[in-house]
């Protein structure tokens, strides 16, 4: 079928695509070096921010004054899930934890949700004003997005919240669909909009895959007429953020009636008590992990009950979660989320008609862990053009390639937007998930695949079956 949407390959800023990225969930290996752990834990022990998780999923009247009377300062509250963030001493936090209406008090750890490390550099050509970007978007062909557009489905009227590290609010591929009034930041000291001077921004790249506009310019997203809202929950500088920011961002997205949340973020925790932070792994009580998981599940459930479909990246650790029972992936390991693994071609430039659905070399997997798969790109081809196996999308000031389950998740979020748009909006997340999985292409495993879950999403089938 011919593509009815075409894009002029232009560059509004001259850029050189010299650095390529592997992004999404941190892949740091858990260590048992007690010396290292103790050193990092000692550094973390000076943290003063705690999450107060109440037994009820609400905040009682007079809560702030009550906390102040005990010697704590309330920094924020998320009453919809009964969670508050306080600044307090260890002694005061212990006193609060003993109150009858408090379920638990846990440190609000700053977690490394996105690996900031660059993938080894390549030296592709600079993008010129006379080139076409569309031909490089192999992921759109893999999921039959052009065929879906030809049916008239483009995500019109659907709101997608991008919970990430902000968005470049000036990018011409994004501004037509970006709701700046609703965009918000939950990162202390940072605006939702990415500041100038950063070559790569994770959230900007993700947003382009979801809903870069059909404007005869640059790239195009899976749902080119969907509205996107930047909900900044990670620092644009480090890719890290506290649990409370993630939870508050999820609730906010639901409150503004987002139809879809995309979270191309995640971290692997050990159920016995290890947390990945920007300073390394720290050892914490296992019960803290359980309570942190409980609080985040509350946020997910709130959004789900409010009609928001939640799409998340499965992770980049190459872990089989069917056999690693001690590992916990958040948020992909929670209920009521669509967890997305990554696929890619191999030497696509040299073999453009080859398989586009090879499981990516890094992707986390497992029948218990993956809902569906989608294009995420890879970098293991020996070809001199290996970077074309990655996903091309928007970055501040231009476009760049990147690979990871972070790139797979927005493909699925875009397809979810197409489904909801066809339904006229306000669609039950359970029904969205059902349509995604029922129309996914079964690549192996008869719809229960180790790497693909129910299959690789198919945009055309999703809006026609």
Functional labels for PLM-detected ranges:
Residues 149-155, 198-200, 220-223, 240-263, ...:
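Mature extracellular/periplasmic domains of secretome proteins
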Residues 220, 258-265, 269-273, 306, ...:
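C-terminal subdomain of the subtilisin-like protease fold in secreted/lumenal serine endopeptidases
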Residues 2-13:
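Bacterial N-terminal signal peptides that target proteins for export
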Residues 64-134, 347, 358:
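Autoinhibitory propeptides
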Residues 13-48, 126-127, 131-133, 255:
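Bacterial Sec-dependent N-terminal signal peptides
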Residues 329-421:
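Extracellular S/T/G-rich loop segment that most often corresponds to the catalytic His/Ser-adjacent loop
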Residues 122-227, 233-235, 248-249, 255-256, ...:
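Active-site core segment of subtilase-fold serine proteases
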Residues 51, 85, 159-163, 208, ...:
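Structural recognition of the beta-strand scaffold that forms the well-ordered cores
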